[in-house]
C-alpha cells in the first residue's frame, strides 16, 4: 500500500503538468471531454482545506481563453498587481464549478508560454526596473490608448477561424464568448467601458526577449515613441552606459536609436486638455526632437531623475569634450535614423495594424505611388525632365540666383540649427542686405520662412553647456533668436558676418565664450577675425555683397563720369577693328538688341576693366614718383662722390656717412620700385584678359577722345586684340554707324559711302 501511494504521489504531479500543457493546445471535442473527466477526478483527490495544497490544477480555459493561467502563477511571486487580484477573485467566485485549482509546488520551474499566437497588437510593458528587482513585463492590447490608461480595446472581425474553447463539455467560439470568458474581443459600448475597471494582463517574457538588454540598464520600459508623421510606435526604451537606447522589439540585438544623454536637453510636458499623453521631449544636437510618452507623472519624474544622475557626472568633469568628440557621428546617425523612420512609417505601418485601422492608413500608403512612378520611368524621360527643370531654374529671381551661385564665393550662406518653440530645427540661412533669411532648404530659395533685420542687434555667444557652439541675436537685450553651428569654425564665421552686418561697435576680440576649452576658443576667435575682416573689407562693403551681374543696364552709362574712368564701347562695323586704349576716356556700351543676351558677360567685363584700369593708373603714378625720387637720389649720390674726392679729415668722414645713408635709401627705393613693377605687370595681364573677354562676348575697346577724332592723333599703346566678326546675321542686325573708327582710310571711306546711299 505504501508503494502504491508513493507511485500515486509521483503520478499526480506528472498528470498535473500534462493537463497544463494540454490546456494551451488546440484540442478536439473528444479530447476536451477526456480532459474534463480527468479534471473531475483530480478535484475528488483535492485535499482538505487545512492540508498542504501540493497538487492543484486550474482549468485555464475558463479564464481569458488560457491566459489567466499565467496570471495565477504571479500569486506565488512578490508582485503588486493592484486591480488584477480583485478581478481574479471575481472570476474565481463566478466560476468555482468550472475550474479546479492546483498551483505548482514552489520548486517547480516556470511554466512554458502558451503556444497560441497572441493578437497582432499585443505589446509588452516593462515595469520600471529598480535595484534588486527582477524585470516584470505587462502585456496590453490597445495600442491607440494613452500610455497611462491601457484599455482592452482590441477588436477583430468576426469569422470562423477563432480557436474553440470548451467549458464543461460545451463548445464556444471566441467571438461568441461572454465578456468575462474571453479576452480576444471587448465590447465597444461606451457606457460599459466607462463602468469597467482598467485591466492589465501579465505574461512571462519569452526566451527571445533578450533580457541581457536590460540587465545593466539604469531604467527600462516600453514607451511610445512619436514618429515623424504623428504615429506612435511602442519601443523598448532603456538608459544604459549614459545613453538612451530604443529597440523596436525586445528580440532585437542592436538598438534602433542610440543617443548620448550628455548632448540632449530633456523636458517634461504633462498631460492636459490638448495633449493626451505625458511626454518626455529630448532636444537632439542636430535640431530634431525625440518625443517619448510615459504612463504617468510619477514615471516621468523617475525617468528625469535617472537622466539627471546620468548627465551630472559627465557635465561636471568636462562639459565640452563629449560635444566635440561625438558631434559629427551623432548627426550622421540621427539623419540615418530619421530616414529609416520615415520609411517604416510609409511602408511597414500597414502590416502591423489590425483590419479596423486599414481605412485610416490608406491615405498614408498612397505616397508609394510616386515612388513607383519614378521607378518605372525610363532613363530618357528622366533626363528630359531634368533638362526641363534645369532650364526653368535659369529664369529664377535675381535673389535666388545670387544666393545659389555664390555659395562658394561669398561665405554668407549655410546650415544653422534654429531654436523654434523649444525645438531645434535645421534651416538654410542667408545674409543679404543686413537681413538674415531662413529657408527650409537650400533648394527652395524663392520663399523664406522668416527674416530678421540685423540693424541695431547684438550677437552674444553661448547657450548652455549642452550647446557649446550656439549663439544668440539680441535686440535691446531681448532675445530675437538662438542659432547653433556645427563646429567651432562655422560658429566663428557666422559671428564675424553677423558682427559686420549688425553694425555693432563690439569688436571680435571682445566676445566672451563659455562652455568651451582654450583650444576651441582660439579656433573660434581666429575664424571670427577672418570673417569680420572679409565682411568689412572694401570688396564686400562697396559692392554690398552684390556680383557684377546684379548691376542694372541703365546704370552702366554715366555721362558725368570723371576722365580716366574705363568705358568700353560696342563696335559696329562690317569687319574687324583694332582694339586699343587711348589716353582719354574709354567707354563700355551695350548693343541695344543684344543687351539681355550678353548682360552677364558684359557687366563682368565692364567691372573688371574699370577696376584694373584704375589700379593700373594708380600703380603707374606710384612708379613715376619712385622713379623721379630715385633719379634725384642718384644725382645727389654722384655729387657727393665728386665732393668726397676733394675733402679730407673730419669733413670726409661726414661725407662718407651721408653717402652710406643715401646708398641705403636708394636700395630701399629700388626694392619698392621692383615690387611696383611686379604688381603692374600682374595688373596689365589681368586687364588684357578682361579686355580679351569683352570682344568674345560682344564688346570692343575703342578709343574716343572728348573732341572729334583727328587724323594726326596717335594712340599711346599698340593694338591689343582684333575683334572677329564670325556671324553674318550678327552683322546684319547691327546698325551701320554706331561708332566711328579713329583711324583708317578704308573704313572712313566706307562710312562716307554708306551715308551717300539713298
From Swiss-Prot:
Role summary: May be involved in podosome and invadosome formation.
Regions of compositional bias (Pro residues) in chain numbering: 102-120
Chain ranges of the PH domain: 216-312, 409-503
Compartments where located: Cytoplasm; Cell projection, Podosome; Cell projection, Invadopodium; Cytoplasm, Cytoskeleton, Stress fiber
Polar residues composition-biased segments: 137-148, 342-356
GO CC terms, sorted: anchoring junction; cell projection; cytoplasm; podosome; stress fiber
UniProt feature, compositional bias: Low complexity: 177-186
PROSITE patterns in alphabetical order: PH_DOMAIN
Keyword Cell cycle set for record: no
Entry keyword set: Cell junction, Cell projection, Coiled coil, Cytoplasm, Cytoskeleton, Repeat
Chief site of localization: cytoplasm
Gene source species: Xenopus tropicalis (Western clawed frog)
Protein name as catalogued: Actin filament-associated protein 1-like 1
Biased composition (Basic and acidic residues): 749-758
Leader peptide range in chain numbering: none
Pfam families to which the protein is assigned, alphabetical: PH (PF00169)
Residue ranges the record marks as coiled coil: 602-690
Residues spanning the membrane: none
Region of interest: Disordered: 91-194, 335-369, 692-758
